[in-house]
């Protein structure tokens, strides 16, 4: 029996980190809709999800954003931030850094107040050293 090697090439739409994405795929897993969650529980979960993304760049941006803004966000803004965290890590990173050539900004995020706040923080106008905030 002969073994044949087959080379598979995955197209990645210019994103070196993400697997190819098919928007029409029926295999999409919908985010969990949490009900009955207190504001404090939600904030604690969002802090955790902001810090434990798996990609250092996203961890730094999102954990600093959470530390700076979570306490002052309204309930609707917390919901919007929760929805943003359901997006893929590299997409959030590229949107936050306004690198739309790599990952175009979807229409659903074009008027996002939270994304605009995240983009402003990502500019780091104060030139702070980026590190994970203390818990």
From Swiss-Prot:
Note: This protein may be expected to contain an N-terminal transit peptide but none has been predicted.
Known partners and oligomeric status: Interacts with the flavoprotein subunit within the SDH catalytic dimer.
A biological-process GO annotation: tricarboxylic acid cycle
GO cellular component, one term: mitochondrial matrix
Keywords: Chaperone, Mitochondrion
Annotated compartments: Mitochondrion matrix
SUPFAM superfamilies, alphabetized: YgfY-like
Family as reported in the entry's similarity comment: Belongs to the SDHAF2 family.
PANTHER family membership: PROTEIN EMI5 HOMOLOG, MITOCHONDRIAL, SUCCINATE DEHYDROGENASE ASSEMBLY FACTOR 2, MITOCHONDRIAL
Function, as annotated: Plays an essential role in the assembly of succinate dehydrogenase (SDH), an enzyme complex (also referred to as respiratory complex II) that is a component of both the tricarboxylic acid (TCA) cycle and the mitochondrial electron transport chain, and which couples the oxidation of succinate to fumarate with the reduction of ubiquinone (coenzyme Q) to ubiquinol. Required for flavinylation (covalent attachment of FAD) of the flavoprotein subunit of the SDH catalytic dimer.
Keyword Chaperone among record annotations: yes
Protein name: Succinate dehydrogenase assembly factor 2, mitochondrial
């Amino acid at each position: 029996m002969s073994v044949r090697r087959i080379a598979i090439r995955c197209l990645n739409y210019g994103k070196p980190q993400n697997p190819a994405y098919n928007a029409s795929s029926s295999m999409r897993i919908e985010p969990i809709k949490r009900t009955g969650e207190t504001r404090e529980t939600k904030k604690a979960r969002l802090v955790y999800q902001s810090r434990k993304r798996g990609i250092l760049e996203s961890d730094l941006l999102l954990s600093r954003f959470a530390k700076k803004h979570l306490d002052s966000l309204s309930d609707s803004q917390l919901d919007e931030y929760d929805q943003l965290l359901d997006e893929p890590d590299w997409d959030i990173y590229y949107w936050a850094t306004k690198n739309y050539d790599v990952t175009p900004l979807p229409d659903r995020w074009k008027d996002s107040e939270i994304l605009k706040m995240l983009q402003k923080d990502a500019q780091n106008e104060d030139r702070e050293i980026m590190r994970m905030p203390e818990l």
